[in-house]
Curated annotation (Swiss-Prot):
Record protein name field: Xylose isomerase
Residues that coordinate or bind Mg(2+) 2: E217, H220, D255, D257
Cofactors demanded by this protein: Mg(2+)
Binding site for Mg(2+) 1: E181, E217, D245, D293
Gene: xylA
Source lineage: Bacteria, Bacillati, Actinomycetota, Actinomycetes, Micrococcales
UniProt key word Magnesium: yes
Alphabetically ordered keywords of this record: Carbohydrate metabolism, Cytoplasm, Isomerase, Magnesium, Metal-binding, Xylose metabolism
Organism: Clavibacter sepedonicus (Clavibacter michiganensis subsp. sepedonicus)
Single Gene Ontology MF annotation: xylose isomerase activity
Pfam families xref list: AP_endonuc_2
Location(s), subcellular: Cytoplasm
């Protein structure tokens, strides 16, 4: 398999990722700001297909209309010259001091109204650029102190805002869906909708739930100690995987934003296997952008920035290659059958069977030989996982 990225791979990068200057809570920038035109040109040369951005990545918070339009025009020119697309746009409701207690859920009602206006304006820009997804990461929606935030009221204000946005895109006729990005903490001590499961439950309370899905990020779910691949399976099961953020994370700690695959490599392997081979008939289960939300390490210069961008795509393609070999291995197929992996898709009840029928079925309980599972009838899961790891390590062809 070719390891050179192409537009068909649908790799995309956030402008805030390749444009990260290295500043962190303990030190200032180690690199200069990246111009948006250079960013578009370089990711195009590397084989990406898309660029995403927050409004404040493209033009500074508080920019005049003229300054804003200048940057939009420059971006449009670069997109036209390179063929790069904008599949997703988002709004920064976390950096400016006005959002220190959040945007949609700030205790200050005037701030909430300002946040909605900021988002509505950026939705218009997303539609203008042809973006199909609008991501909402509520990085400041939360609290450090239990007494400081009425969570019930905050969730109602969150719901009110998202319902309004759904009305807006519907009335405007925009072909845009929303994707909530969960995160357990950082920058707030506790963030509302901290995990994929919380977000999925919240979506079901909305007036237009069909317009809202999730944008899970590898590191965010792993910060909560969760299995990212399992979470993606549930999002796919519920038809809510509208976008995905790929990066690397090594355990329960701060949000590292490493290159994809440079953290939990085994989980990255199972994720790529799911995305590429987990659909009906073994095809793709998700056909949207493979979006890299990472930070080039603070230690790197501009050469290292582009090396790290290329590394994300190469890691994904390497894992895709390993996953395809894993699926094609006859020994793996035998191990999958022995583990009865496919049997989970067989309904537990027979067609038309009720609880009366299963209660009357002696083979399901009275005559079922449960004792035969002691010292026998192992599932062979360890063998299957060993085969997966050997393929991941390139030990099997």
């Amino acid at each position: 398999m070719a390891l050179t990225p192409t537009r068909e791979d649908k790799f995309s990068f956030g402008l805030w990722t390749i444009g990260y200057t290295g500043a962190d809570p303990f030190g200032g920038p180690t690199r200069s700001d990246l111009d948006v035109v250079e960013g578009v040109e370089r990711i195009s040369e590397l084989g990406a297909y898309g660029l995403t951005f927050h409004d404040d990545d493209l033009f500074a918070f508080g920019s005049t209309d003229a300054e804003r339009q200048t940057q939009i025009d420059r971006l449009k020119g670069a997109l036209s010259d390179t063929g790069i697309v904008v599949p997703m746009v988002t709004t920064n409701l976390f950096s400016a001091p006005v959002f220190k207690d959040g945007g949609f859920t700030s205790n200050d009602r005037a701030v909430r109204r300002f946040a909605i206006r900021k988002v509505l304006r950026n939705i218009d820009l997303a539609a203008e650029l042809g973006a199909k997804t609008f991501v909402m990461w509520g990085g400041r929606e939360g609290a450090e102190y239990d007494s400081a935030k009425d969570v019930r009221g905050a969730l109602e204000r969150y719901r009110e805002a998202v319902n309004l946005l759904g009305d807006y895109v519907t009335d405007k006729g925009y072909d845009i869906r929303f994707a909530i990005e969960p995160k357990p903490n950082e920058p707030r001590g506790d963030i509302l909708l901290p995990t994929l499961g919380h977000a999925l439950a919240f979506i079901e309370t909305l007036e237009r739930p069909e317009l809202v899905g999730v944008n899970p990020e590898v590191g965010h779910e792993q910060m909560a100690g969760l299995n990212f691949t399992a979470g993606i399976m549930q999002a796919l099961y519920q038809g809510k995987l509208f976008h995905i953020d790929l990066n690397g994370q090594r355990g329960i700690k701060y949000d590292q934003d490493l290159v994809f695959g440079h953290g939990d490599l085994q989980n990255a392997f199972s994720l790529v296997d799911l995305l590429e081979n987990g659909g009906v008939g073994g095809g793709r289960s998700y056909d949207g952008p493979r979006h890299f939300d990472y930070k080039p390490s603070r230690t790197e210069d501009i050469t290292g920035v582009w090396d790290s961008a290329a590394a994300n795509m190469r890691m994904y393609l390497l894992l895709k290659e390993r996953a395809q070999a894993f699926r094609a291995d006859p020994e793996v197929q035998e191990a999958l059958a022995a583990a009865k992996v496919a049997e989970i898709d067989t309904p537990t009840l027979n067609e038309g069977e009720s609880y009366d029928d299963i209660l009357a079925d002696r083979s399901s309980y009275e005559d079922f030989a449960a004792d035969e599972y002691f010292d026998a009838k192992g599932f062979g899961f360890v063998r299957l996982n060993q085969l997966a790891l050997e393929h991941l390590m390139g030990a099997r062809s």
